Amino acid sequence: VPCPIVELRGYLAACGLKGRLYAYLDYNGPTGTSRDSVAEGMLALAAEKHKLLPGQPIIEAASGSFAMALALAGRTAGHPVVLTMPEDAPALRQEYLLRLGAQILHSPAQRGLAGARALAETTAAEKGWYYMNWLANDDNPEYHRRVTGPAIVQAISREGRSLVDTITVGVG
């Protein structure tokens, strides 16, 4: 489902600037966050590059919106999803992720996210699972180059001519 592009008419004027400013609203996926399209796209790229094999378990150090999106995308694509997180991660979040079909492995609370990442990396190596490592994975920006950027340019075009001068994105 294409994501809407809206013009933020009052923002530039309020800042005393000229031009036009648009926002790409990537919320049409099942979790309602921009992470849905990223998780699906990264899984597709990993499979295309034969880094992710059919039915291969996926492991990731995450507990937020990307974890939710990955749990759904992985299950839909036929991959078990295992999430690593510190043992003191919020119980309600863990329960939600379990209901989405993910499995959870805990790392020591005192090691924080670094401990969860180390557990994911070690487990992937030992068991032959695919470690997504989404924030450091080149498939993340590649997905946006292939899909998000062209979608924005196409949406903000007139008579086949792009009206886009600059694209600014948030990271994280």
Residue ranges and their predicted role:
Residues 1-172:
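PLP-dependent amino-acid enzyme catalytic core
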